[in-house]
């Protein structure tokens, strides 16, 4: 028996194709999806729409996913929201650095639908 916890996920990704793919995987799995194409937009949406999980890219124009992570964890309104970093940076040091910034899980690109869902389920209490 598989139990799917339906929740709302904020995806932060500046690549339209990646954003579309991730949204498709999550919507297909029953999640509600909020999209943001940059960190500034993500900070606003994280506060106004209270997502259950935030999935973010690392390399984005303006503010990186790591900086976004730190900002979210410093803000009392968003500090408890689990963050999944989704990045093409695949070295162990990148994963460790993400965790130091406050990330709760790390997925490397390219990822499968199952890898993404497992990471999200691992951070939802």
Predicted regions and their residues:
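C-terminal output helix
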Residues: 111-120
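Short hydrophobic/Thr-rich beta-strand motif most characteristic of the beta2 strand and flanking loop
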Residues: 30-37, 45
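Charged docking surfaces used in two-component/phosphorelay signaling
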Residues: 20-28
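Receiver (REC) domain active-site loop signature in two-component systems and cognate sites
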Residues: 60
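Active-site beta3 strand of CheY-like receiver
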Residues: 49-55
């Amino acid at each position: 028996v598989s139990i799917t916890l339906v929740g709302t996920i904020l995806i932060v990704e500046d690549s339209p194709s990646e954003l579309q793919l991730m949204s498709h995987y999550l919507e297909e799995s029953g999640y509600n999806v909020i999209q943001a194409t940059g960190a500034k937009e993500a900070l606003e949406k994280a506060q106004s729409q209270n997502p259950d999980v935030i999935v973010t890219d690392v390399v984005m124009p303006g503010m990186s996913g790591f900086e976004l992570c730190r900002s979210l964890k410093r803000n009392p309104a968003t500090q408890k929201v689990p963050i999944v970093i989704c990045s093409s940076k695949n070295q162990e040091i990148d994963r460790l650095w993400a965790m130091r910034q406050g990330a709760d899980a790390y997925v490397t690109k390219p990822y499968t639908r199952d890898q993404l869902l497992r990471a999200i389920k691992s951070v939802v209490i």
